[in-house]
């Protein structure tokens, strides 16, 4: 006869279920203003490529040419300082910089004087640069609209970018 062995009951382990993820409700606390500077508004516009027209040849730089050029933005001529390297243009075009600077009051702004040293440094290193005057500055047509939240300056900048792409 075999000895009997009493087997204790094996406790079962109940698997813990993860707690359900909390539901997060987001309430809008502020309305996005309907403004022409909103990304959605800017994306809804067209920025037609305008040809960049050279109007005046200036004295050359060390290894580049300098010009006063303009493009069209919302029916206005926007002038600026254009530098073009003397070297032959690469197959995919010159590396280009659209030089957008901070606000300078229109009554003191001079196309060929402001930021010239910076633009010269870029041009000496083989970059095509274009520094638009912005609306109402220098010889650019239209009205200067101030330093902050200017829809026209944003539009003029995007149109300048399109002009450089062609």
Predicted regions and their residues:
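Glycine-rich "HGGG/HGxG" loop immediately N-terminal to the catalytic nucleophile
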Residues: 136-148
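Short beta-to-alpha linker loops that shape the active-site pocket of alpha/beta-hydrolase fold enzymes
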Residues: 86, 103, 133-137
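N-terminal cap/lid segment of alpha/beta-hydrolase-fold proteins
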Residues: 42-92
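Ser/Thr-rich, Proline-interspersed low-complexity disordered segments
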Residues: 1-35
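Short amphipathic alpha-helix adjacent to the substrate-entry channel of hydrolases
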Residues: 111-131
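Alpha/beta-hydrolase active-site loop
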Residues: 147-166
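Loop/turn elements at helix/coil->beta-strand transitions in domains of secreted/extracellular proteins
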Residues: 77, 93-95, 125-129
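Short beta-strand element of the alpha/beta-hydrolase
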Residues: 91-104
């Amino acid at each position: 006869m075999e000895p009997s062995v009493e087997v204790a009951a094996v406790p079962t382990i109940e698997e813990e279920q993860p707690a359900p993820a909390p539901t997060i409700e987001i309430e809008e606390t502020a309305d996005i203003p309907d403004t022409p500077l909103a990304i959605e508004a800017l994306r809804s516009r067209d920025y037609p490529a305008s040809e960049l027209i050279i109007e005046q040849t200036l004295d050359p730089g060390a290894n580049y040419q300098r010009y006063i050029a303009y493009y069209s933005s919302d029916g206005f001529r926007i002038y600026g300082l254009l530098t073009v390297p003397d070297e032959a243009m690469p197959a995919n075009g010159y590396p280009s910089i659209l030089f957008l600077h901070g606000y300078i009051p229109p009554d003191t702004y001079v196309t060929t004087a402001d930021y010239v040293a910076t633009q010269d440094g870029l041009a000496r290193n083989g970059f095509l640069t274009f520094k638009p005057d912005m609306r109402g500055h220098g010889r650019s047509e239209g009205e200067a609209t101030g330093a902050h939240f200017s829809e026209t300056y944003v539009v003029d900048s995007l149109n300048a970018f399109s002009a450089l792409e062609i």
